[in-house]
Structure formats: C-alpha cells, structure tokens
C-alpha cells in the first residue's frame, strides 16, 4: 500500500498547484491527478451538483487503489469533505484548514481576507474554520470569474487586473494585511492580486501547507513511500487532454509529456 499513488482531485487545473507542492516536498510519492475540466469552474454550481461530481470522481480514484485522497478544490471541500471522510477507508486531506492555519500565523493586525468562488464563500467554510482563531476579523469576497480566466489561460493583463481591483476593493477597505487565496486556481493570479492589494498584504496559498498535511498524515498512517526510484505520475482530465496539458505545463514545467494526460469519462451520478 505504501507504493500506491496519492489521488488528487480538482475541478480543473488549479489543484496542480497542490500537486506541484507535494511533488517538491515528497519526491518519492506517485500522484494520480484528475481535473474535472469538462465541468469547470465549480464556483457557480449548486453545492449538491459539486458534491455529486466530486464523489463520482473520488469513488473512481479509490476504486483504482489510491492510498490517500487530496481534495485540492475549495468548492469541493466545502461541499462534501465530511461525506468523503465517512465514505472512504483511506485518509482524506483538504485545502481549507491548512490555509487558515497559515493565515492566523501570518497576520499582524488580525484582519484577514478570503477570496474564493461563489460556492466556497456561500458555504461559509472559511468563516467556520476561523471561529477557532480568536482575535481574527474575517472579511470575504466572492470572485466568480477568476477560475474561468485561469482555465482559459488568461492570468495577466488589463482586463484581469481591473476585475481584481473591483473584487478586492472591499477587502482593501477592511484593511486586511493577509489574503487567503481560497481557490487553488488563484496562485496563477498572484502577480495581479499582489498588484491590486499592495505589497503590504501577504498572500496565503494553501498548496505548501496542504503538502505538509499530506506528509504528516502519510507518516501517521505509516504510508510513506520508500525513495527507491522515480515515481510514475498520471494526470488526467474529463475534458480536452490537449488543453489540459498546455495549462498543466505552467504548473509542472515544460517536461510534462502530453501523452501523460488521458481523457477521463466519469458518470456524474453518485449515491
């Protein structure tokens, strides 16, 4: 079981930021990644639809024999994290709490902002997570178009900057000094987001902290792979493999082979 892959799921390409962090911190672990690009972005979808899509794909990953699941999508974590942990015998790691812990440790004035998809913000997953952090004042803002821009490979330019300034203005007015990127797509917008918020604001991505959680949980369950060679990774998408591969190279580097990306058909029905 220790040599079984880690299963990673995201609505599209954003979870590749988490995959990259895991590859960097745990180079001996094999990854099996599925991006539901045919149905991205998840943000505008009802939580029930997100739950059904997520569990359909995570069911398939567990059936393939992964030793751990990483739900590398904030919207999916908000929709069905509890369901997934009750449903599967393998450990399930998510991306919300790691980002919250980092933000609490980072803020200097106690004012933290969170941006995410409409589904993530509506779910109040971050509001609930921050309740255990006394002294933190939380401000949130939905950024419904960001994930779609990233999925289309548009991560800079005047249009994206203007959108960011409009979305983030309430958080600037709230004087936040720490901004949680509550969607794994958003690290590709770091340049635009930093410009819109100013250098005095620290941006927090969950990717690095999630990778630390993966290491901790694998260690606790005695599931760490032995470093005995180059692990085999698989990256798949429910939509166009070619489009996915092009965007994936921005996260994982130009050496990612296009033939490593296979189309995946997954039923959206789930119990």
Curated annotation (Swiss-Prot):
A single GO molecular function term of this UniProt record: glutamate racemase activity
Annotated residues for binding of substrate: 10-11, 42-43, 74-75, 184-185
Catalytic activity: L-glutamate = D-glutamate
Disulfide bonds: none
Residues of the active site: 73 (proton donor/acceptor), 183 (proton donor/acceptor)
Keyword Ligase attributed: no
Spans traversing the lipid bilayer: none
Any one Gene Ontology BP term: cell wall organization
EC numbers on record: 5.1.1.3
InterPro entries in alphabetical order: Asp/Glu/hydantoin_racemase, Asp/Glu_race, Asp/Glu_racemase_AS_1, Asp/Glu_racemase_AS_2, Glu_race
Pfam families listed in its UniProt record: Asp_Glu_race
Keywords: Cell shape, Cell wall biogenesis/degradation, Isomerase, Peptidoglycan synthesis
Metabolic or biological pathway, per its Swiss-Prot or TrEMBL entry: Cell wall biogenesis; peptidoglycan biosynthesis
Protein family: Belongs to the aspartate/glutamate racemases family.
Summary of the function given for this chain in its UniProt record: Provides the (R)-glutamate required for cell wall biosynthesis.
Entries under HAMAP family matching the protein: Glu_racemase
Protein name: Glutamate racemase
Species the sequence originates in: Saccharopolyspora erythraea (strain ATCC 11635 / DSM 40517 / JCM 4748 / NBRC 13426 / NCIMB 8594 / NRRL 2338)
Gene from which the chain derives: murI
């Amino acid at each position: 079981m220790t040599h079984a892959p880690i299963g990673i799921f995201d609505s599209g390409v954003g979870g590749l930021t988490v995959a990259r962090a895991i590859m960097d911190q745990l180079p001996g672990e094999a990854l099996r990644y599925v991006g539901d690009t045919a149905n991205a972005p998840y943000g505008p979808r009802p939580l029930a639809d997100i739950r059904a899509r997520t569990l359909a794909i995570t069911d398939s990953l567990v059936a393939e024999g992964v030793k751990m699941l990483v739900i590398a999508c904030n919207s999916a974590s908000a929709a069905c994290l509890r369901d997934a942990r009750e449903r599967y015998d393998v450990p399930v790691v998510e991306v919300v709490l790691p980002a919250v812990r980092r933000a609490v440790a980072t803020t200097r004035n106690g004012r933290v902002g969170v941006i995410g998809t409409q589904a993530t913000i509506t779910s109040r997953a971050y509001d609930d997570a921050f309740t255990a952090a006394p002294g933190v004042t939380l401000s949130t803002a939905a950024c419904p178009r960001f994930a779609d821009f990233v999925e289309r490979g548009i991560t800079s330019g005047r249009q994206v900057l203007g959108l960011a300034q409009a979305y983030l203005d309430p958080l600037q007015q709230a004087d936040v000094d720490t901004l949680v990127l509550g969607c794994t797509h958003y690290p590709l917008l770091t340049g635009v987001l930093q410009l819109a918020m100013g250098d005095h604001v620290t941006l927090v991505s969950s990717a690095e902290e999630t990778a630390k959680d993966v290491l901790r949980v694998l260690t606790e369950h005695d599931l760490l792979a032995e470093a005995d060679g180059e692990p085999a990774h698989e990256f798949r998408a429910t939509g166009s493999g070619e489009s996915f591969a092009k965007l994936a190279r921005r996260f994982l580097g130009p050496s990612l082979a296009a033939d490593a990306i296979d189309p995946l058909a997954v039923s959206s029905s789930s119990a």
